A protein has these predicted regions:
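Conserved pre-motif C helix in the palm subdomain of viral-like polymerases
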Residues: 1, 7-69, 73-101, 174-200, ...
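C-terminal reverse transcriptase regions that engage the nucleic-acid substrate
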Residues: 29, 33, 37, 113-239, ...
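Amphipathic alpha-helical interaction motifs in eukaryotic regulatory proteins
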Residues: 48-52, 66, 99, 103, ...
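A common structural junction motif
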Residues: 102-111
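RNase H-like nuclease module associated with reverse transcription
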Residues: 208, 259, 298-436
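Structured nucleic-acid-interacting core domains from mobile-element enzymes and related host factors
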Residues: 225-266, 338-341
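RNase H-like nuclease fold core
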Residues: 254-255, 259-307
Length: 436
C-alpha cells in the first residue's frame, strides 16, 4: 500500500526566524518537499499520530512498526511503514478495517498482495508454506546501468579469496572515483535487501571510497558480475519443524521452528594494515536469516579469543534488540507487558575460550582489558537468563562467511544454509560442490 504525494500533502513545519540582516538569504516554501531533509520525518510524525488515534501501538524496538490488538487481546494486524510505503498483515476483518481507516485520511494506492517492495521481489508458495525474497530485477537493472555482462566463466564468489584489497599508494588512485563509489553504493543496496552473501565484500570495497585504484574498481565489477550470475537466488522462509546435520556429530544441532538462533564469528587480524579483526553475526528463524551485520572492530585484538569476545558483544547487542522486538510483537498482549518470560536466545559460538570466559567468572587474567563487554554478556547469560551460548564447530559456523572471503565450496555451503537456497537454484558451476 502506498500514499502518493504523501510528503507534498503534509503541513510544513515552522522554520527558523532569520535575523533581519539575513532576510534575503532565506526562501519560505509553501509546502513540504521531497528534497528537504525533514520532509520524511514530518510525514512520519503525521502518520504516527494518525495511527495512534485509531488504536495502533508503535513498537519501541522499531517506531515504524505498528500493532493493532483485537477485543480478545490478541494481535489482529501488524503494519510496517517505510516513508510512504506500507506492508500490512493480519486477519481479513482487520485488513478491511485498515483500508477504510487509511482511506479516511489519505489518498492511497493499494497494490494488494505485495510482489515488489523496496527493490525486493516477493513470491509465495502457499501450498508448501514458503516465502521467497530476491532482487533479480534490481540486479539486472544495475548491471545494465554499468554495462556489465556475464563472461563465459562467471565468478563463483563475490570476492577473490586469494587476494586482499590493499590501500592505494600515491599516484595510483583513479582519476575520477565517482563511478567506483556508485558501484559500491549499488552493491550495498543489494546487501541491505537480501544479498547477505556480498556483506563482507561490500565492507572491503567501502574501505577504499576516498582513494580507489584500478584493482578496487575491478573487484567491484567482479562482485556485480557475481550478483548478475546469481540474480535468481534469494532468501526463502519456511514453516515447519526441521533438523540440520553436519559432517561432525559434535558440531550438529537442531534448529527449532519459530525460535531465533544466532551465530557470531570473528576473523582475527583480518586487516593487513591495521591488524584489526572483523566481527560478524547472523540471526536465523524459519530456516533462513532475518538479520545480519559485519563490522570492523575498533581496537586491535590480542588473540582470537579476544576478537571472538568482541564479536560476541556485537551479537549480544543485536540479540537484545531481537529479544525486545519479539516480546513487543508477540501475539499475546500479556507477553508484551512483561508478564511472561520468553525463552532465551541461543547464540552459537565456535571459540571455546570465549565461552569459558563468559561462563566462568574466575577466568579473568586474559580479559581484564575488555572487562566491560564481558560483564555485559555475563549479566545477560547468567542473571537475566536472556542468552544461551552454545559451542558449534567451525565448519558449521554460518557466520564464517561474513568475516572473510572463502573458497567457492565453503562459501556456497554456508550461504545455502543461511539463505535456505534449494539445490535447484544453485549456479551450475557450484551445484556439485554444494551438494557434497
Amino acid at each position: 500500500m502506498e500514499v502518493p504525494k504523501a510528503v507534498l500533502d503534509r503541513h510544513r513545519p515552522d522554520g527558523p526566524d532569520p535575523k533581519p540582516e539575513l532576510q534575503d538569504c532565506y526562501a519560505l516554501v509553501s509546502m513540504a518537499l521531497y528534497g528537504l531533509g525533514h520532509s520524511p520525518a514530518a510525514f512520519h510524525k503525521h502518520l504516527d499520530d494518525f495511527f495512534q488515534n485509531d488504536g495502533w501501538e508503535p513498537l519501541e524496538a522499531d517506531s515504524c512498526v505498528y500493532i493493532k490488538y483485537g477485543a480478545d487481546g490478541k494481535v489482529s494486524a501488524i503494519a510496517a511503514t517505510f516513508v510512504d510505503d506500507a506492508v500490512v498483515t493480519g486477519t481479513d476483518e482487520a485488513l478491511a478495517e485498515y483500508r477504510k481507516f487509511m482511506q479516511s485520511g489519505f489518498t492511497i494506492s493499494d497494490a494488494g498482495t505485495p510482489e515488489d517492495f523496496l527493490g525486493m521481489q516477493i513470491s509465495y508458495d502457499r501450498k508448501n508454506k514458503k516465502i521467497k525474497l530476491w532482487q533479480e530485477k534490481y540486479i539486472k537493472k544495475m548491471a545494465e546501468r554499468y554495462n556489465i555482462t556475464l563472461s563465459a566463466k562467471p565468478p563463483r564468489t563475490p570476492m577473490d579469496y586469494n587476494k586482499k584489497l590493499e590501500p592505494t599508494q600515491d599516484g595510483d588512485e583513479l582519476f575520477d572515483p565517482t563511478l567506483y563509489r556508485s558501484y559500491v553504493g549499488a552493491i550495498q543496496y543489494a546487501v541491505c535487501g537480501c544479498r547477505i552473501d556480498c556483506c563482507f565484500t561490500v565492507r572491503e570495497l567501502a574501505k577504499h571510497m576516498v582513494k580507489p585504484n584500478v584493482n578496487h574498481a575491478a573487484a567491484a565489477r567482479h562482485c556485480i558480475q557475481y550478483l548478475l550470475a546469481t540474480a535468481h537466488i534469494g532468501i526463502t522462509y519456511e514453516h515447519g519443524d526441521y533438523q540440520r546435520h553436519y559432517e561432525k556429530p559434535k558440531a550438529g544441532f537442531i534448529v527449532r521452528n519459530g525460535v531465533i538462533e544466532m551465530y557470531t564469528d570473528a576473523s582475527f587480524a583480518e586487516d593487513v594494515i591495521t591488524r584489526k579483526s572483523v566481527s560478524g553475526y547472523a540471526s536465523v528463524k524459519n530456516k533462513a536469516v532475518i538479520t545480519y551485520g559485519v563490522k570492523g572492530q575498533t581496537k586491535v585484538a590480542l588473540s582470537s579469543g579476544d576478537a571472538e569476545l568482541r564479536a560476541l558483544s556485537e551479537c549480544k547487542r543485536e540479540a537484545d534488540w531481537l529479544h525486545k522486538l519479539r516480546r513487543e510483537a508477540n501475539e499475546d498482549r500479556t507477553v508484551r507487558s512483561n508478564l511472561t518470560k520468553l525463552p532465551a536466545l541461543t547464540i552459537w559460538e565456535d571459540n571455546k575460550s570465549t565461552i569459558t570466559w563468559v561462563s566462568n567468572p574466575c577466568q579473568h587474567n586474559k580479559v581484564k582489558h575488555i572487562d566491560v563487554p564481558l560483564k555485559n554478556i555475563r549479566n545477560a547469560f547468567g542473571k537475566l537468563g536472556e542468552l544461551d551460548i552454545e559451542y558449534i564447530g567451525t565448519t558449521a559456523q554460518l557466520a564464517d562467511c561474513l568475516t572473510k572471503a572463502l573458497a567457492p565450496t565453503t562459501h556456497w555451503k554456508l550461504i545455502q544454509l543461511l539463505m535456505n537456497i534449494p539445490c535447484s537454484d544453485l549456479p551450475t558451476s557450484v551445484k556439485m560442490a554444494a551438494a557434497t
